[in-house]
Structure formats: structure tokens, C-alpha cells
Regions:
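Conserved beta-strand hairpin/beta-sheet module of binuclear metal-dependent hydrolase folds
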Residues: 1-39, 116-134, 147
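Active-site environment of divalent metal-dependent phosphoester hydrolases
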Residues: 11, 54-59, 80-81, 112-113, ...
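Divalent metal-coordination and catalytic microenvironments
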Residues: 17, 27, 53, 72, ...
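Short, hydrophobic beta-strand segments that form beta-sheet elements in well-ordered domains
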Residues: 24-27, 49-51, 69-76, 88-89, ...
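Active-site metal-binding motif and surrounding structural segment of the metallo-beta-lactamase
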Residues: 31-77
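Metal-dependent catalytic neighborhoods of phosphoester/phosphodiester hydrolases
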Residues: 60-69, 84-85, 208-216
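Metallo-beta-lactamase
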Residues: 73-126
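Cap/insert and terminal regions of metallo-dependent hydrolase folds
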Residues: 143-232
Length: 232
């Protein structure tokens, strides 16, 4: 199984996971034209798309994806907020299958109607990817995970130095996004014996530091795990 990030920020998010036979688009938060340019794929080449929540940096071209005839999966709350029809409604803990990939949605914690993360398990190679972005924390443990793609949005010490940041913005960050030490503590609680790579998602332009975050995560996980920051 392969994970790839094409956009990962508050300006837009788009990722893919593929196991050779199935190619799934994770989020569609950039323009349709930009998605095709960055990924190198036309809409028709995606088996399906999953959307975590309704915020535009994760969903702005969902109409184009639906119009292209690609199945789109999201929670009922997300579909209602986006006011879209013709999508596949999924819920926490209810497994579904796309091609050769079994997918399990799980609840996340964000200022959205019904946000979800997703676990992907390939029937082709048995690998497991956990995808969770835009969440203040995670309440679940995932045994047998091969790859983690997870939010690492801000550092509380850097945030504290942003004296001119409006209090409303500061409050939203701390109550809906994952702080780097929270992530590290979560990773320490996991059995990562089967994990080969961790991807850090959605790093803030103003309140994160890519090199610092990578080093902190390396200190929190076993030595065999590779850490990659997806900051474009």
C-alpha cells in the first residue's frame, strides 16, 4: 500500500492511497484542475473518494468529483453541511469496501458537524493505513498499523509567542487541531511494531516547525519507523 500527499495545509488537502489495484482519493480540498495537475490522474482514474468533514480545505471540489461519476463517501452530517446528494453515507465503526480495500470510519474531534478519520486495510498486501487529520486528539488504538497519516498542526510554545493572534483564532486552534506533544504522547501509547512510516499532516504555517516536529516524533517512536512531514 502506498500513501501520497499532494496538498496538506489550511489552504487545501488532497491525498491518495493505492494498493496497486485500487486508488482512493482522500479529501478533495483543492481545485479540480490543481488536483489533476498535482496527482497526475484524471478523475476517472480514482476508484473512490473519502471526505473527512465539510470544511472547504477538505471538500471544495467535491461537486466535480461527484459529477465525474466517482463514488464519494462521507458522514451524514458532512453531506448535510455540504448540501450534496448522490454520495455514500458512512458512520463510525461501520466497515465498507472499495475495490480491494476495506475501510473503517472512526470519529474524530474537530469543529465540524460529524468529522471522521479512516482506517484502510488492503486485501492485496494486508497493509493498514490510519488517516486522521483535523482532530484535537484520537480516542482509539489501531493494532497492526503499517502507516499512520495524522495531524501535527501546532506547537503550544510557538503559539504562545504569537501575541498578535486574535483570541478567537487561538481558541479554535487549541480546541480543534492536534498539538505536537499531544501527538507524541498518543504515538507513545501505540504498539508500532508493524508500523513502517508516519506522515505528519496539516502543519500550520504560523505555529509549527517541520524539522522540530520530525525530531520530536522520531524521539517518540521506535527506531525502525520513518517520519515524513507533508507540508505542501
Amino acid at each position: 500500500m502506498r500513501f501520497e500527499a499532494f496538498a496538506s495545509s489550511s489552504h487545501g488537502n488532497a491525498y491518495t492511497v493505492t494498493d496497486g489495484g485500487t486508488r482512493i482519493l482522500l479529501e478533495c480540498g483543492i481545485s479540480h484542475k490543481k488536483l489533476q495537475k498535482l496527482s497526475g490522474f484524471t478523475t476517472a482514474e480514482f476508484t473512490a473518494c473519502v471526505v473527512s468533514h465539510e470544511h472547504k480545505d477538505h471538500s471544495c471540489c467535491v461537486g466535480d468529483i461527484i459529477a465525474g461519476g466517482i463514488p464519494v463517501y462521507m458522514s451524514e452530517g458532512t453531506a448535510q453541511e455540504l448540501e450534496v446528494a448522490g454520495v455514500q453515507i458512512v458512520s463510525h465503526g461501520e466497515e465498507f469496501t472499495v475495490g480491494s480495500v476495506d475501510i473503517v470510519p472512526f470519529n474524530t474531534f474537530h469543529d465540524a458537524r460529524e468529522p471522521l478519520g479512516f482506517l484502510f486495510r488492503s486485501r492485496t498486501d494486508g497493509e493498514v493505513l490510519v488517516f486522521a487529520t483535523d482532530t484535537v486528539n484520537l480516542a482509539y488504538r489501531f493494532p497492526g498499523v503499517t502507516m499512520l497519516a495524522i495531524e501535527a498542526n501546532y506547537d503550544k510554545e510557538i503559539l504562545a509567542r504569537c501575541e498578535r493572534m486574535p483570541e478567537k483564532v487561538r481558541h479554535r486552534i487549541t480546541n480543534s487541531h492536534m498539538e505536537i506533544e499531544v501527538l507524541c504522547n498518543y504515538l507513545r501509547s501505540l504498539d508500532l511494531s508493524t508500523c513502517r512510516e508516519i506522515y505528519l499532516l496539516h502543519l500550520s504555517d504560523a505555529t509549527s516547525h517541520e524539522g522540530h516536529f520530525i525530531n520530536k516524533v522520531y524521539r517518540a517512536v521506535p527506531k525502525h519507523v520513518k517520519v515524513t512531514a507533508c507540508s505542501r
